[in-house]
Design a protein with these regions (language model features):
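Catalytic machinery of carbohydrate-active enzymes
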Residues: 1-158
Length: 158
């Protein structure tokens, strides 16, 4: 019988988000291995995800090794070391899929992020403010503050 699996994902939000379709495929194709995700850069990208949320653990989770890892096979995918990626044959998400699932280049669904109500309200407020100030109908918003951003109090109308 095969051992269960733990997949380590390191780096920031971009790497975490890029890993989502490959991990979804792994779960779909290896449900019997009951995979968990060890999120070295935080669990934010997996929060609220119907298949991944309950599988995601911070690397500082109490008793992580003893309770969750010691009886599992450990995968540490490194998409930047995948030949197809560094030869520009595939995307970062596909490189994760190759590193995790070893099925070559294949089409993957888009990564979906589940946003909280607070995040949606904050984004609406930010977009409305920028549209009002610029007079433009279409905008692109970059949020360069990472986890350090402090949202203001919001209400449903904003």
């Amino acid at each position: 019988m095969a051992r269960k699996t733990a997949i380590f994902v390191n780096g920031g939000a971009g790497r975490s988000i890029s890993s989502i379709p490959a991990i979804e495929k792994y779960i779909e194709e290896n449900a019997d291995l009951d995979p968990i995700i060890i999120c070295e850069g935080g669990t934010d990208a997996y929060k609220g995800h119907p298949k991944l949320h309950y599988r995601a653990y911070d690397n500082w989770h109490k008793n992580l090794f003893q309770d969750l890892l010691k009886d599992r096979d450990l995968l540490s995918p490194e998409p930047y070391r995948v030949w197809e990626y560094y030869n520009q044959k595939c995307s970062l998400g596909q490189a994760y899929d190759i590193a995790i699932n070893d099925k070559g280049i294949r089409d993957l669904p888009r990564a979906n992020l589940k946003l909280s109500k607070e995040e949606i309200l904050l984004a609406r407020k930010m977009i409305a403010e920028v549209k009002e100030k610029t007079g433009k109908d279409k905008i692109v918003v970059f949020q360069p503050f990472g986890r350090g951003a402090q949202p203001e109090k919001l209400d449903e109308k904003q």
